[in-house]
Amino acid sequence: HQLSGGMRKRVALAQNLIVNSELLLMDEPFSALDVQTRQIMENDLLRLWSEFRKTVLFVTHDLEEAIALADRVVVLSSGPAARVIGDYPIELPRPRDVAEVRLDSGFMNIYRTIWQHLHGEVKKAYERTRAR
C-alpha cells in the first residue's frame, strides 16, 4: 500500500513529535498538498501545537499561511545573503481555524502591513529570475 501525500505529511509530523525535541523545524511542509488537504494539515498542526506546546520554526513563502499559523512572522530579504527585514507579532485569537481566521479583519490588517514591506523584496526576486 502507498500513502497519499497528506498521509505522508501526517506521518512526518508524528515522527517529529515522537522525537520530543523542544524545537520543531518545518520547511514548507504543506507546499505540495492540494488546498483542502493543506488546510486540514494546518489545523492538525495548530491542534497538536496547542497540545504539545513546542516551539515551531515554520518556513513558508505563503504569507497567508504564515499569518494563519504563527504568533510571530519574521520576513527575510530576497537573495542568497538573506537578512531579517521585518518582525511582526501576530495577535489573533487562539484557538484558530486556518480558513476562518483569514476572514478576520485583524488578519487582513496584518496581511496589508507585512505585504507593504514584503512586496519590494518579491519584485527584486522576480526581476533577478527574469534577468537569467
What are these model-derived regions, one by one?
Residues 1, 19:
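Conserved signature/switch motifs of ABC ATPase nucleotide-binding domains
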Residues 68-75:
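Conserved catalytic segment of ABC-fold P-loop ATPases
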Residues 78-111:
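Conserved beta-strand-loop-alpha-helix hinge in the C-terminal portion
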